[in-house]
UniProtKB/Swiss-Prot annotation:
Molecular functions per Gene Ontology: structural constituent of ribosome
Name assigned to this protein: Large ribosomal subunit protein bL17
Keywords: Ribonucleoprotein, Ribosomal protein
Quaternary structure (record): Part of the 50S ribosomal subunit. Contacts protein L32.
PANTHER family in UniProt: LARGE RIBOSOMAL SUBUNIT PROTEIN BL17M, RIBOSOMAL PROTEIN L17
HAMAP family according to UniProt: Ribosomal_bL17
Domain of life: Bacteria
Designated gene of the protein: rplQ
InterPro entries the UniProt entry points to: Ribosomal_bL17 (IPR000456), Ribosomal_bL17_CS (IPR047859), Ribosomal_bL17_sf (IPR036373)
Cellular component terms per the entry's GO annotation: cytosolic large ribosomal subunit
Source organism per UniProt: Synechocystis sp. (strain ATCC 27184 / PCC 6803 / Kazusa)
Length: 116
């Protein structure tokens, strides 16, 4: 039974949700910060933390797992080159979520998620 095993649904089927999280993760690591809804920012936070932890490990197996998840190969190589020195003293909490103004069209809660 799957009692209390909740994942953020984000109003999408599982395949679309996974693709969305992969795309948001790739773009956040590429650009350093992105603007999205608060629910999506909270959902992507754990995926980004997982990728940075893989990059801190630095092994070939970790690199291959990151390449299998993220959409952009040069971004993965840049992450693996940069993350071990940038986050060596930090054991998690690699992102910061800052709430911003609500979206004009549908009044959705918006946020900026950025790498610390």
């Amino acid at each position: 039974m799957r009692h209390r095993c909740r994942v953020p649904q984000l109003g999408k089927p599982a395949d679309q949700r996974k693709a969305l999280l992969r795309a948001l993760t790739t773009e956040l690591i590429r650009h350093g910060q992105i603007k999205t809804t608060k629910a999506r920012a909270k959902a992507v936070r754990s995926e980004v933390d997982r990728m940075i932890t893989l990059a801190k490990d630095g092994s070939l197996a970790a690199r291959r797992r990151a390449l299998g998840y993220m959409y952009d190969k040069p971004t993965v190589h840049a992450l693996f080159a940069d993350a071990p020195s940038r986050y060596k003293d930090r054991d998690g909490g690699y992102t910061r979520i800052i709430r911003t103004l609500r979206r004009r069209g549908d009044n959705a809660e918006m946020a900026v998620i950025e790498l610390v």
